[in-house]
Regions:
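Flavin (primarily FAD) cofactor-binding/catalytic cores of flavoenzymes
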Residues: 1-115, 119-322, 332-347, 351-355
Length: 355
């Protein structure tokens, strides 16, 4: 039984949690509150870009796809001021280009360590460049097997990947369309946008502006920045313990669900069933989409979601119906879904908050 906000209830034999992305995490910065008047905690809110002075300055926290989206949206709405983009490493998404197909080079005998996989990928990139190819071909070749690679890694190696490789993987895997990349490049080269590598350390809000302290990654010097607005562009929150959502909170509090061991979503079994606090898969609660990232890693983009939904539908029909109709499996299709062919910045991909 599912209780809705208006007090009504729904009764179902199975419930699929397909909540999509949640708002960005709260930034644990001295002086900063999500209620601060000049701070925008979620760039996806309807009023996120309202009342920003057209000739003022804006600080975007995070340098992934979300910050690119916001920067482009600001300029589209006539913003003529300066855009500061701050993230720990100052890495921006790479630009997508049309490429040829690179042969699959990962197999069951490939390394099961982060370091070994890095060596393998770098060797393929060198081979591509020596043969007048492109590193993008190598990265794209991994897409059909990324979930298999993730599942093959022990927990310790998954953690090592998240600590050391994730930011670099994200900017190469989740690229931006050439026309969007050209706009961002022009903003930077014309002095209308600046990308900083560092960490925000303090926030002070005044009646007409904001002052932030941040530590420069290269020099380790403390710096001061004055802006009119600060926007959280760090991407969706994935740690379910921190998600401010009544449904997620209720599932955790009642023991119907538990976080995965990497805190990238909820723990699920291979069929997508939620695993409760005792470690038992639920017979009626399932998950679909980004909330399964901990077990699949690639669980955001459209091709993977189509396949995931098809597999889950087949499983549920097989379990709930006495004589279910045969379902034709949906194969992942990346053709036609590249960023080069999309009008928006994203290729239905995930935000990378740690770049």
């Amino acid at each position: 039984t599912v209780q809705l906000k208006d007090g009504s209830t729904l009764v179902a034999k199975a419930v699929v949690l397909a909540a999509g992305n949640f708002p960005p995490p709260n930034l644990n910065i001295p002086g900063l509150s999500e209620h601060s008047e000049r701070y925008v905690p979620s760039p996806w809110s309807a009023a996120a870009l309202d009342d920003i002075p057209k000739t003022g300055s804006v600080l975007l926290i995070g340098s992934g796809l979300t910050s690119v989206d916001v920067a482009v949206a600001l300029k589209t709405e006539g913003f003529a001021g300066h855009i500061h983009i701050l993230s720990r490493r100052g890495l921006m998404p790479r630009i997508h280009r049309a490429t040829s197909r690179w042969p699959q080079f990962w197999n069951e005998q490939s390394p099961r360590t982060t370091r070994g996989l890095l060596r393998l990928v770098r060797a393929q990139v060198r081979a591509a460049s020596e043969g007048y190819g492109d590193w993008r071909e190598v990265i794209d070749a991994l897409r059909p097997v990324t979930q298999k690679i993730w599942k093959s890694l022990p927990l310790s190696e998954r953690k090592r990947f998240l600590r050391h490789v994730r930011p670099f993987w994200e900017v190469h895997r989740h690229r931006i369309a050439p026309e969007i990349g050209d706009r961002i490049t022009h903003l930077v080269h014309s002095g209308k946008a600046t990308v900083h590598a560092g960490r925000l350390t303090a926030y002070r809000e005044f009646s007409h502006h904001v002052e932030v302290d941040w530590r420069d990654r290269q020099t380790q010097c403390q710096r001061l920045m004055r802006v009119d607005r600060v926007i959280n562009c760090t991407g969706p929150e994935t740690d379910c313990r921190q998600i401010d959502d009544p449904l997620i909170k209720g599932l955790l509090a009642q023991g119907f669900a538990r976080p995965d061991r990497l805190f990238l979503g909820l723990d699920v079994d291979p069929n997508g069933a939620l695993v409760d606090f005792a470690g038992t898969p639920s017979p009626f609660l399932y998950a679909l989409g980004p909330i399964r990232k901990g077990s699949l890693w690639e669980s955001i983009a459209v091709p993977e979601l189509r396949l995931q939904a098809s597999q889950l539908a087949e499983h549920l029909l097989g379990r709930l119906l006495p004589h279910p109709r045969k379902i034709h499996r949906v194969a992942p299709q990346t053709a036609g879904l590249t960023l080069a062919n999309m009008a928006t910045t994203r290729a239905a991909s995930n935000e990378e908050p740690v770049s």
